[in-house]
């Protein structure tokens, strides 16, 4: 039996990325992988040979243990660093618990409300993916409720900050103007702000992002004490730059390299503001042929 090597069984998971219009295959180990069909959606955690554990919802990649820290640091800390008060924070979505984990790193947070519409998914993540939350669900400051985000934000409860960590915005089927209007109303009295995941930035296809920014711009035009900011960071497992939009009360908002010491330097250096001129649809990747006189 000398020289006999035991080989772990490797399977293949297929993802259809509707945003980029491509399919991807991931090799993974059956051990430490899990699958569930909830009343709301289908969820898979696969133990990838490269990305470690990966979370898919309805077949679309949401997060990997190898690089989720990039996304969640970029989503949470620029807003948190901006808020004058951090007493009461709301998360809409964030079922895996990593967003809550990052918010709870701030000692000034007294109360964190997390609202997700899928209780079965949250329980699934607690058991099969505790590496995402890293104990956040046991923090006494955290309360988890299971409601629709659009309905919950209408309750009129005030917060210092709101973090919208829902799946990529679908402007055709979801009422985003209503959600963002009510979200701003929930932070207006306290002069707070909100941040949202705005999806993939593709220079050759910016209409969806521009439409989303237009909603935010219109909100700020009717609430002059607030300003909006758009920034990106590269997330390797997403194969591109991810976009975030912040609406914050006039004052400090820094997303340049000097901001927020809580973010690791290697992540911070990749977070950049997205100028308006990079949203023009004429950017199509065609090489420029005009002469350069320099």
Where do the language-model regions lie?
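A general beta-strand register signal
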Residues: 56-57
């Amino acid at each position: 039996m000398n020289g006999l090597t035991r080989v772990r069984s490797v399977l293949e998971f297929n993802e259809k990325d509707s945003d980029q219009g491509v399919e991807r295959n991931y090799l993974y180990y059956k051990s430490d992988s899990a699958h569930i069909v909830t009343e709301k959606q289908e969820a898979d955690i696969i133990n990838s040979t490269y990305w470690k554990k990966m979370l898919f919802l309805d077949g679309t990649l949401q997060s990997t243990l190898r690089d989720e820290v990039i996304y969640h640091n970029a989503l949470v800390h620029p807003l948190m660093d901006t808020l004058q008060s951090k007493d009461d924070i709301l998360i809409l979505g964030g079922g895996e618990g990593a967003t809550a984990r990052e918010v709870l790193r701030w000692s000034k947070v007294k109360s964190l409300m997390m609202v997700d519409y899928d209780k079965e998914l949250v329980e699934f993540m607690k058991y099969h993916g505790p590496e995402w939350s890293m104990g956040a669900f046991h923090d006494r400051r955290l309360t988890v409720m299971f409601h629709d985000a659009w309905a919950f934000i209408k309750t009129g409860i005030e917060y210092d900050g709101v973090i919208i960590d829902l799946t990529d915005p679908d402007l055709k089927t979801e009422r985003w103007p209503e959600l963002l209007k009510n979200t701003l109303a929930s932070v207006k009295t306290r002069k707070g702000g909100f941040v949202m995941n705005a999806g993939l930035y593709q220079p050759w296809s910016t209409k969806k992002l521009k439409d989303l920014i237009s909603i935010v711009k219109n909100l700020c035009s009717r609430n002059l004490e607030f300003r909006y900011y758009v920034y990106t960071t590269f997330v390797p497992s997403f194969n591109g730059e991810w976009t975030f939009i912040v609406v914050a009360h006039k004052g400090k908002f820094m997303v340049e390299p000097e901001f927020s010491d809580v973010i690791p330097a290697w992540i911070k250096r990749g977070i950049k503001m997205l100028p308006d001129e990079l949203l023009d649809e004429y950017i199509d990747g065609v090489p420029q042929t005009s002469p350069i006189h320099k």
